[in-house]
Each structure stands twice: as C-alpha cells, then as structure tokens.
C-alpha cells in the first residue's frame, strides 16, 4: 500500500539568481582589464596633472618679465610691416596706437606659442597613454599568469583528474601561498576519493563470490524434483533475496566506477542503446500491460556503450515498474537538439510531488517508504544514471508529469 510522501524539509530554491549575468557584460570587465584600466588611468591622471603644471608655469613665464625692451618715441621716417602681425603697420597710426599694436601682437604670439605647447603636449600624452595601457595590459597578464595556471588545474580537477597539481614556482607571495594551499586540498581530496572508491570496489568484489556460490547452491537444490514444496518455496524466496543482493553489489561497483571520467570513448548511438533497453524490458512490460512506444532518431555520442546502456535500461525499467498496470504507457525518444544528444523517457504512473524529485537521484532513496516490498531494484538506478551522465560530461533531470508519472531527460554532448 502506497503511503503519503513526507513534507519537504526545506522550501524550494528560488529560480531567480541575483548573481545572474548582466545584460551589459562590458560593465563587469575581467580583472586583467580592470588592472589595465587602473595602471593606465593612474598614468593618464599623472600625465594630465603634470601637463597642467607645465602649461601654467609656461604661461606665467611668457607673461611675466617679457615687456618690450624698447619703446618707439618717433617714427616719422620709420616704415614697419609684418606678415605675422598685419596690424603692425605705421601707416596712419599714431605713436601710442602703434606701440599698443606691437604689445597686442606680442600677446598674440605668446598665445599661439602656448596653444602649440598644449596641443603637442596632448598628442604626446595620448601616445604615451596608449603605450602605458598596452604595458599595463602586458604586466597585468604577467602578474595574473599564476591564476591562469590555477584555473587550468581546477578545470582538470573538475574533470575528475585529482592527480593534477599546480606546483607553482616563484617567490613566497600571496599567489604561491594560494597555489600551495590548493595543492594541499587536492592531495587530501585525492586520498579521500581513492580510499572511498577502493573500499566500495573491494567490498563489492568480496561480496560477489559468496553471493554467486549461494545462487549456485540454491539453483542446484531447486532443480531437484524430489525436493519438498516448502523447501522449493523457501529456495525461491532465498534466490530472489540473493538476486537482490547481487543487484546491490553490482550497482555499488558500477556507481563507484561511473564517478570517474570516461577515458576510452567510442561512438555510441543513443537510439540503438534505447532500443536494446526496450528489448530487455519487453517481457516485463507485456506482463504488466504497459505499452512502450516512442520515436527514436539517431543521436551519436562519444562514450562508453555499456554505461550508456545502463542509463537507458535503468530509466526504462523504472518507467515500466512504476507505472499503471493494464493501461499505462512508456514513451522513449532520442534526438539531437541544439548540438546535444537527448534521451527522454516519459511514463504514466503515480503522482510524484515536485519536492521529491531531487530525492530520486540519491542512493537508496525511493518514493515508497517500505524497504522489503515487492518492488524490484535496490534504489541505485537513478544514482547510477546520474553518475554515468556526469562522467560523460552531461546531466540528467526529472520533472513530474501532469497527471502522474515522470519525464526523465538525459542530455549528453555530441
């Protein structure tokens, strides 16, 4: 008998992220650009201040102590002409007007000299600013180069390569301290993950042998036609329990292996993988009265065929087992969407609360509360599927279907 799912332990996460990318990315430049702007801006401000001081000092110098050394007192027979100061022409000018014209002409020449000084200084400042920004960009790149090395190592670690280290050389500064701390963290993580995977792998291997022996002994006793009915019934029950334990061991071993990055990749068609999964659950679907349908288009990915087949088999098996007997259906579709291969498994079934969807991917977590019911499986199927999808650089998501059931979607890079 199905029970009412427990209420959620925490409210759903908000869909809006206040740290989402701004519509104007240039408003949030990289740290290298910001350092370049800082270096170049400081040089530009210093240059402007220096130019202003030089201009003011030059203006004061040309305006102070530069009075004419002579004064014309009589120009009866003097003829003066100037191409740079046309107003200096004694024809028709009085003596005082002529002296005033000479003073105005000198003021004009001083102004022209200051304007030339300012324009040429601005051009020189502009050229030096360009050089300063280029030099600042190069220096910022050199200063930040250790961060690039740290980033590349972190990306390699994100790909499940915990053996990578930064090993930064150089002076004992803040960046080297950061790199050394990061290396120490990677060392501890590698030891922890290695110990975990070794334990799971060894435990699974050690449990395989006695389970296989138990299965063989039970099958031999069940094949005896003279065995009592009670003994045969007990043997079938023990055989089913043993099979469940074998599935658990295989699931744990596969879960431990699938957390690693896939090294050897080969072309795998998701349509073919889905077809094989459907063939394996065909008898179970027929016995339960569940229709399996869908359109499967070619969707070739690079990966491990056995692990990808396990994803499809787990999803299709769950879709058949957790369905409506006699009138349910399962739809399996594959396609290539937006440059990615997609496997979608949709099924009818009981209503799944939205807050329970994330729990489906946790090991040994199922919607039913009983642990010894008639359901097959051990609660590792979706955990394995998620681990395998991540190992292939993809992801798997689940959504409740309106009216009951789930929509499982696996997305893998082509």
Curated annotation (Swiss-Prot):
PROSITE patterns: HAMP, HIS_KIN
SMART domains named among the record's database cross-references: HAMP, HATPase_c, HisKA
Classification via InterPro entries: HAMP_dom, HATPase_C_sf, His_kinase_dom, HisK_dim/P_dom, HisK_dim/P_sf, Sig_transdc_His_kin-like_C, TCS_sensor_his_kinase
Class in the EC hierarchy, top level: transferase
Record field: transmembrane: 37-57, 121-141
Pfam families named in the record: HAMP, HATPase_c, HisKA
Membrane topology of the entry: Multi-pass membrane protein
Chain's role: Member of the two-component regulatory system CutS/CutR, involved in the regulation of copper metabolism.
Protein name: Sensor protein CutS
Gene name of the encoded protein: cutS
């Amino acid at each position: 008998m199905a029970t009412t799912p427990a209420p959620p332990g925490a409210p759903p996460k908000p869909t809006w992220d206040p740290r989402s990318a701004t519509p104007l990315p240039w408003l949030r430049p990289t740290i290298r650009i910001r350092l370049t702007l800082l270096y170049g801006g400081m040089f530009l401000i210093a240059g402007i201040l220096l130019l202003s001081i030089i201009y003011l000092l030059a203006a004061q110098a040309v305006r102070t102590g530069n009075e004419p050394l002579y004064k014309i007192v009589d120009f009866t027979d003097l003829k003066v002409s100037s191409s740079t100061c046309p107003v200096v022409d004694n024809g028709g000018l009085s003596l005082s007007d002529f002296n005033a014209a000479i003073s105005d002409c000198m003021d004009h020449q001083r102004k022209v000299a200051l304007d030339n000084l300012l324009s040429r200084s601005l051009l020189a400042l502009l050229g030096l600013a360009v050089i300063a920004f280029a030099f600042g960009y190069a220096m910022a790149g050199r200063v930040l180069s250790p961060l690039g090395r740290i980033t590349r190592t972190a990306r390699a670690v994100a790909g499940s390569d915990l053996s990578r280290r930064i090993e930064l050389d150089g002076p004992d500064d803040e960046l080297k301290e950061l790199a050394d701390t990061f290396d120490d963290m990677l060392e501890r993580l590698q030891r922890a993950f290695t110990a975990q995977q070794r334990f799971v792998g060894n435990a699974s291997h050690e449990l395989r042998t006695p389970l296989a022996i138990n299965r063989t002994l039970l099958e031999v006793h069940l094949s005896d036609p003279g065995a009592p009915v009670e003994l045969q019934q007990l043997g079938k029950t023990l055989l089913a329990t043993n099979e469940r334990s074998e599935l658990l061991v295989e699931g744990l071993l596969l879960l431990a292996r699938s957390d690693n990055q896939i090294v050897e990749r080969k072309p795998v068609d998701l349509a073919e993988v889905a077809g094989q999964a459907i063939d394996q659950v065909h008898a179970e679907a027929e016995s339960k009265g569940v229709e399996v349908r869908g359109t499967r288009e070619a969707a070739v990915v690079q990966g491990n065929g056995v692990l990808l087949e396990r994803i499809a088999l787990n999803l299709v098996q769950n879709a058949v087992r957790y369905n409506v007997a006699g009138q349910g259906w399962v739809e399996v579709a594959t396609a290539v969407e937006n440059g990615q291969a997609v496997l979608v498994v949709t099924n009818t079934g009981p209503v799944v609360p939205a807050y329970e969807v994330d729990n489906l991917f946790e090991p040994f977590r199922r919607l039913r509360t009983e642990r010894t019911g008639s359901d097959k499986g051990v609660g590792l199927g979706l955990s394995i599927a998620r681990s395998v999808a991540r190992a292939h650089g993809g992801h798997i998501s689940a959504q409740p279907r309106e009216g009951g059931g789930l929509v499982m979607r696996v997305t893998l890079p082509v």
